[in-house]
Amino acid sequence: MSNCAIVGINWGDEGKGRMVDLVTADYDVVVRYQGGGNAGHTVVNEFGKFALHLLPSGILRKGVVNILGNGVALDCESLWTEMSDVMDQGVAITPENLKISDRASLLLPWHRDLDSLEEARLADKKYGSTKQGIAPFYSDKYQKKTIMAGELLYPEKLWDHLAGILEWKNLTLERVYGAKPYTMDDLKAWVAEFGEKIKPFICDTGAFLRQAQAEGKHIRLEAQLGSLRDLDYGIYPYTTSSNVIAAYAPVGSGLPTAKLDKIIGVVKAYSSCVGEGPFPCEWFGEEAEKLREAGGEYGAKTGRPRRVGPIDIVATRYGIQCQGATDIALTKLDVLSYMDEIPICARYELSGQETDAFPFPAVLPDAKPVMTAMPGWKCDISGVRKWENLPEAARNYVEYVEREIGCHITYVSVGPERDSIIIR
């Protein structure tokens, strides 16, 4: 038996989905332990290209049981749309290979409305929400003003609970934002259209996981986004509304006593970011556009162009410390092949002093990157499958990053395909 978490080290979009897809061949269960449909994992395999937002990445592997844990923001509408799209591409999804925690709270229709209304109110002070309802959902969850997926199995209790929440929520919609209220008929129609579709997948996943653990099954846990978007340890307030770090994995998965034997942190060979907030190494203009095009840096959920720049050693080292990573997967090394020199942010300058420490969020906008560079390799490496066959300059770059971040780089990806990963 082993428990392994795969997590993002930076701002998200590091390539976690394809790493889970790769290593899940050796695992029996994959659990998504936090977040909602506001970010995506991209996986390329024999069925095609998939942008997964809520479904665990193990859904693309036969024989793997996939679980949406109690820490997930369960958006029935988005989940069913995603399930339908994946099934249309030839992937089977049944209650045998997808299980939804009865303790996962439901993202309700008004959560999206409130997200958009608040972003509009904030105007130029907005945080860059994806408008998927995530912040209003988690706010309601911690106010105990939402419902659990398991309540869909008990309709009479569900309607009584929803009626009380509806009255309270309409006060916010009408009196704070001047928006249209919801009715019970609206909610019943929503449950009939989307809630009923996911009911066959809802069960006591905690009991399932405890049994799997007792049987010595291998369990993988995955999250969305990265360390710098964690609610407590990220660049607040430009974070998501949940804890993405590996320490939360046992709690959000439904197996709170689990010990993590391995934590694989995923780092991109350069930096990218979607949304607002400080991004010390950001490039602009032609330089940024060239890297963005080379890496296909557009949000899997929103399609928005990602902000890009060179690898940030300071932020990466901090992200690894937050996650407690035991191994690193360095992704998209091949994207850098067009560069004559590979730029690296080695340190920050803050208040006239150079520092290796990641600053407190309030002063991070004042940090300036201190740059260095290494020779590029200027050749296609997408077909390389052995470490020793990489150009010397590429190996030197990987080894430099490894030394600076203080964690072994076990995996190096050189392309989007399932087999385009070098294991060191």
Sequence positions of predicted segments:
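Non-transmembrane, aqueous-exposed alpha-helical and coiled segments at domain scale
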Residues: 1-424
